[in-house]
Regions:
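Conserved active-site segments centered on acidic
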Residues: 1-45
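Phosphate-binding/catalytic loops
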Residues: 65-127
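Conserved acidic residues
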Residues: 52
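Short glycine-rich anion-binding loops that position phosphate/pyrophosphate groups of nucleotides
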Residues: 59-62
Length: 127
């Protein structure tokens, strides 16, 4: 969402709904993004939505992702699961921060390569 601005509708969903992980909330707050009020969504509730892209970020999600609309490009990027990291709270937060940074790098590149080319150069004039 951050890198695409208003140029794209962005959804986040998983194979099941669950409470937002507090390490994820803390990690995102450290990056000045408040996700504390967001709710998780089940991908099954979005199967009637037409998507240009569906991006899966773990191998389990890739295997469970339902078929989407025709023309939808599926992209898979496997990020490590920070929930799998044991140790102290500091170790766990560090794992979330590393994955957050990896996802940020991917999101920036994805928007630059796939979304920005679709935006007319004179977008300000069209608004």
């Amino acid at each position: 969402r951050y890198y695409s601005g208003n140029a794209a509708e962005v959804y986040s969903a998983g194979d099941e709904s669950y409470d937002i992980n507090m390490f994820a909330v803390k990690s995102m707050m450290d990056a000045v993004l408040d996700i504390s009020h967001q709710k998780t969504k089940n991908i099954a509730k979005l199967t009637d939505t037409d998507f240009d892209f569906v991006i899966t970020v773990c191998d389990e999600a890739r295997a469970m992702c339902p078929e989407m609309n025709e023309g939808c490009r599926k992209i898979h990027v496997s990020f490590p699961d920070p929930n799998a990291v044991g140790g102290s709270e500091e170790d766990k937060l560090m794992a979330f921060n590393m994955v957050r940074d990896d996802i940020e790098d991917f999101a920036f590149d994805f928007v630059h390569n796939n979304i920005r080319p679709l935006i007319p150069e004179n977008i300000e004039e069209l608004i």
